[in-house]
Amino acid sequence: MNMEKIRAIIDKDRDSLIDTIRELVAVPSVGGEAPRPDAPFGPGPKAALDKFVEIGARHGFRTWAFENQVGVAELGDESLPEMIAVLAHVDVVPAGEGWSCDPWRGMIKDDLLYGRGVADDKGPAISAMFAMKALREAGVRLKRRVRLIVGTNEELGSRAIDRYVTSGQELPVAGFTPDAEYPLINGEKGSITPKCRAPFAPDGGDVQVLSLDAGVASNAVPSKAVAVLKVAPAAEARLSRVVEEFAAPRDAKLTCEKSASGEYTLTMDGLAFHGSRPQYGSNAAANLVRVLRLLGIGGEQGAFLDKIDALVGTQTRGENLGVMLYDDVSGF
């Protein structure tokens, strides 16, 4: 294999690679939308799937879509009996707030590319395709076919790839995914997304929480949390004091507004980050719960807030929940 020739091809294709990543990033493909008969995981992921197949065909690969859930671009002689897989995905988490650029445009600044999906996982998917293109143009003789397989539901459970595997599609003899860090990750955590529901009886206290909302995805640190409060006149001074004296943590900001109807809205801004590395974010929900506790809310609401803060709080390893795990090989 002539690596100098391959590197020269990659250098030649640099601008085309960047433009193609931007082309795919420009398709908003947030999961969780209502399914359609032709779009099992919503129209956004389906549109990104179609765009991926179009791009693959344009660059000379055998391409097809499986049940509008999985896209394939394949390199190598069809007579080769074995196949190596490259696994990626084209669905993304919501863009959220706080962007200084259009998350669906793919902006280049200081030689960096910014946009939702640039790193997870549209950029890596297209980079893998261009690596396959470089192998082909360099005349590398393959012993096995290389199949780039992209799913449309990775962020919400990988049901697309699960369907691909369980339906009897050809399976690879080996594979890897560029949805990770270089050079290698050889293990992956499990995850649970619980949903809890509990009624709160009115307690007649001078501060009551009417609503508390935060986050746009279960696998990301929430960057914004909003609480609407009913505050008795006797408690307004206490609310003002708590807001003024609250020592906002890193990357956090608290604001308070009173509506014409007399309700108060507390807004906590934080810093979103992928759920695999929550220590780098600032959890707006956890910080706002801490503020609400300082207001001395009583009854069942107060007990719930106390429990959430005690068990979860701003911890990122689940110590108080009893789920923290460490070993010498994989770390935390």
For each feature predicted by the language model, list its residue ranges:
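Metal-dependent amide/peptide-bond hydrolase catalytic core
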Residues: 1-5, 193-332
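Solvent-exposed alpha-helices and their adjacent loops that cap or buttress functional pockets
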Residues: 77-79, 106, 140-142, 166-170, ...
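Acidic/histidine-rich catalytic neighborhood of metal-dependent amide-processing enzymes
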Residues: 121-201, 234, 240, 316-332
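Flexible loop/turn segments at secondary-structure boundaries
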Residues: 94, 156-158, 183-185, 217, ...
